[in-house]
Each structure stands twice: as structure tokens, then as C-alpha cells.
């Protein structure tokens, strides 16, 4: 294993201070990022200098490997300033488990780099993937695509693409590691929210690409790290759903906190049209509004923080060889997704209340409130956060019925 040395401190407080110092730049660049459909290379450099791409990276490769609860704080802080920048941060922190789960050789390729940007883009790990792989001597031939929603593929050296791998008449969903120089990014990220995340589709430059055998791993093995973990940290034994979705909810929380701060700034001394109130902050309707926003935001934060901490606890248990009961893990996986979706909904509703009471000037392109309003709705639309489906699935478990499964995961 080749360790990569970094001089910067990895403490949570240091990283948060760095994010706060560059946060205003993220907000200033947001309009241009939306027009370009991607954050700028300067923003990627600022994130890298702040250390955010190493918060979920193995210590053995110079990463900070922060606990999930601390990663949640970093992602929340970035989201206060800009949603698209937070999305890039979230993906950059939480997809590293896929690289680790693919085994030591793949992890070595991904993390043994001096790059200060994100390490890995992971996309299309769904049964409906358009990617295909067929077995040949010494490896696989990959074809098909394109792969949509390839967040961070603009900046990573590697992308892990979902494929249906076929061998000896049998098939499975797998992840295959492809270097950036064999891929092209399609200009198809034209969306209503998270516009600057640069989540374009990617496609193979050639019709077919050969990859060595070790770079293709069934997703069932990736999810359980069946290829063996040489890393010491408990993060790599924590439930990946808890890691991914509790921190995802952190984006919604940060967006809501940023809008609340912006609302208070705008409301000070602002008259409410159609009333005798000359200062919105002194008006009783505002006080009721703020109280309602507080309850929604606090509920979201309490659920999300509890799930992040529980993820860390389960990781420590697994690292100490204390087995996690399968039924306990199933309940946790169902609950963390449901509560992440509910937290995202509560935060989107809080932002909606603040937006609706910010006046018509809040719809200006330069106004962070309207941007966060759109970005927060995008989080609620993520395919894994379908609240109605998640309500049903957890309710089935409560009623003693087997939950629905997706790709073998409840």
C-alpha cells in the first residue's frame, strides 16, 4: 500500500473554519455555476484546499476519515452557502465506500494520488443500467451506456460504472472501474435545481472498452466489502446506507439554515406590504413563521444527527467483531432512508415558508433564497428518497410483513 502524506490538519474544527472562510465565494459564484451547469474549477480547488474531499477518505491514503457524524457537519456547513457545491462535497465524501469495497487493487488506484479534487464518481448502479460487460480472457469488455447523473465525473480520475455483467449464462449487477481518459461527458445537465452540480451523463469514447478482471466487482460484494478490507478504520465497516443518506439529509439542513440566516438579514427593517408593519422582524406573523420553521428544522436535525451517530456506533461494533444482527441492520437501513427523506421534506417546507414571506424580490436570479428553494426540492426528488414508498416499507416492517427489496437491499 502506498501512503500519501498531507500536511494539513484534519480536525473537524479546522475544516469547518476553512469552509466558512471560503463559503462566501461559493455563494458569489453560484449564478455563474448555474449558467455553466457546473461549479468552477476554482470552487473545486477551494473545496480541496479546505480538505472536504478527504473527510471520507482512508487514513492510509492521507485522508481524514472523519466519523459520519462529523462528515454531516461539514456537508451541512457547505450547503449553507450553496447547494450545488454541497452536492459535489457530499458525493465526494460518501462514494468512497464503493472504491474501498472493490478491493485493495482498485482502492490503490483510486486513492494513491496527490489530487486535491474528488477521488471517485460512481454512477448507474441500478438494475436498469444501460451498461453491459461480457467476460473475456483476463478481463471484461464493457459497452453500452450512457450513464446518467454522473456527479463529480468532470473532476475525478476514475468512474465506477454500473453494468450488467454476463458470464457463463448468468448475470449480475456490478461496478466497473473506468479511467477518465476512456470516458466523455455529455452536455445534458439542464435542470431546475442543483444546476451547478455538473451531474452530466458519461459515455464511453469507444464502443467497447477492455478492463482488467479485478476492476469489475459484483455490487453485492461491494456493499459487503467481500473482497476484504485492509483498512483499519471503523468507517469502512459502518452501514453504507447510514453513511450516505444521513449525510445527504445534511444538505437539506444546511440549505434551510442558510435560507433562515438570509431571511433574517433581509427582514430586518423591511416593511410588510398591505399591513402597517414597518419592520418584518417585529411583526407577529413573522414570529409565528419563525417558530414553525424552527420546529421543522430542529426535527430534521435531531433525526439526522441520531442516524449519523448510530451509523458510527454500528461501524465500531463491526470493527470490534461484534456481529450486527441482520434484523437490526434491516430495520436501521429502512429507518435511515425514511428519516432522511422526511428530514429533506421538512427542510424543503421550511424553505418554502421563508421563500413565500420574502417578497417578490426573492425571485431574482442573484438571490440565494430562490436557489436554495429549488435545490432543496431536488433532494426530495432523489430516487432513493421517495417518501411515500419509504413510509409504506417501514410500515410493513412495523406490521410484521417483509419489506420490499431493491437490488437485494430493503
Task: Locate each region found by the language model.
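Charged, glycine-rich active-site and insertion segments that engage polyanionic ligands
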Residues: 331-366
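Basic/polar N-terminal segments that are highly enriched at the extreme N-terminus
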Residues: 1-17, 21, 409-410
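Glycine-rich flavin
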Residues: 41-49, 54-155
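C-terminal structural cap/anchor segments
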Residues: 288-342
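Glycine-rich phosphate/cofactor-binding loops in nucleotide/flavin-utilizing enzymes
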Residues: 358-410
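Glycine-rich beta->alpha junctions and the first turn(s) of the following alpha-helix
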Residues: 200-297
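Generic structural signal for well-ordered, non-transmembrane alpha-helical segments
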Residues: 20, 254-257, 261, 291-298, ...
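A short core secondary-structure module
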Residues: 149-190, 198-201
Amino acid at each position: 500500500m502506498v501512503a500519501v502524506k498531507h500536511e494539513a490538519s484534519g480536525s473537524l474544527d479546522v475544516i469547518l473554519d476553512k469552509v466558512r472562510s471560503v463559503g462566501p465565494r461559493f455563494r458569489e459564484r453560484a449564478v455563474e455555476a448555474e449558467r455553466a451547469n457546473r461549479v468552477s474549477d476554482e470552487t473545486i480547488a477551494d473545496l480541496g484546499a479546505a480538505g472536504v474531499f478527504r473527510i471520507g477518505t482512508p487514513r492510509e491514503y492521507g485522508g481524514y476519515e472523519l466519523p459520519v457524524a462529523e462528515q454531516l457537519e461539514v456537508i451541512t456547513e457547505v450547503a449553507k452557502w450553496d447547494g450545488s457545491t454541497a452536492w459535489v462535497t457530499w458525493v465526494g465524501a460518501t462514494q468512497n465506500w464503493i472504491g474501498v469495497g472493490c478491493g485493495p487493487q482498485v482502492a490503490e488506484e483510486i486513492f494513491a494520488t496527490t489530487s486535491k479534487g474528488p477521488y471517485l464518481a460512481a454512477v448507474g448502479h441500478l438494475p436498469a443500467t444501460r451498461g453491459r460487460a461480457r467476460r473475456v480472457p483476463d478481463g471484461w469488455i464493457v459497452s453500452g451506456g450512457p450513464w446518467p447523473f454522473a456527479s463529480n465525473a468532470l473532476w475525478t480520475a476514475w468512474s465506477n460504472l454500473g453494468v450488467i455483467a454476463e458470464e457463463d449464462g448468468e448475470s449480475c449487477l456490478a461496478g466497473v472501474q473506468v479511467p477518465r481518459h476512456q470516458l466523455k461527458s455529455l452536455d445534458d445537465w439542464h435542470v431546475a435545481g442543483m444546476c451547478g452540480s455538473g451531474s452530466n451523463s458519461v459515455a464511453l469514447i469507444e464502443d467497447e472498452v477492455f478492463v482488467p478482471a479485478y476492476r469489475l466487482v459484483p455490487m453485492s460484494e461491494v456493499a459487503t466489502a467481500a473482497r476484504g478490507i485492509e483498512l483499519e478504520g471503523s468507517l469502512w465497516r459502518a452501514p453504507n446506507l447510514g453513511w450516505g443518506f444521513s449525510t445527504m439529509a445534511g444538505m437539506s439542513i444546511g440549505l434551510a439554515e442558510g435560507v433562515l440566516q438570509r431571511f433574517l438579514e433581509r427582514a430586518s427593517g423591511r416593511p410588510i406590504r398591505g399591513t402597517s408593519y414597518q419592520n418584518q422582524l417585529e411583526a407577529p406573523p413573522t414570529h409565528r413563521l419563525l417558530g414553525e420553521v424552527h420546529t421543522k428544522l430542529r426535527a430534521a436535525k435531531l433525526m439526522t444527527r441520531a442516524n449519523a451517530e448510530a451509523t458510527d456506533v454500528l461501524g465500531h461494533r463491526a470493527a470490534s467483531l461484534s456481529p450486527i444482527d441482520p434484523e437490526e441492520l434491516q430495520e436501521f437501513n429502512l429507518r435511515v432512508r425514511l428519516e432522511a427523506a422526511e428530514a429533506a421534506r421538512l427542510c424543503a417546507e421550511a424553505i418554502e415558508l421563508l421563500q413565500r414571506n420574502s417578497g417578490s424580490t426573492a425571485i431574482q436570479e442573484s438571490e440565494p433564497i430562490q436557489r436554495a428553494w429549488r435545490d432543496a426540492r431536488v433532494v426530495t426528488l432523489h430516487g432513493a428518497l421517495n417518501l411515500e414508498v419509504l413510509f409504506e416499507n417501514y410500515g410493513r416492517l412495523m406490521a410484521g410483513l417483509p419489506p420490499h427489496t431493491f437490488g437485494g437491499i430493503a
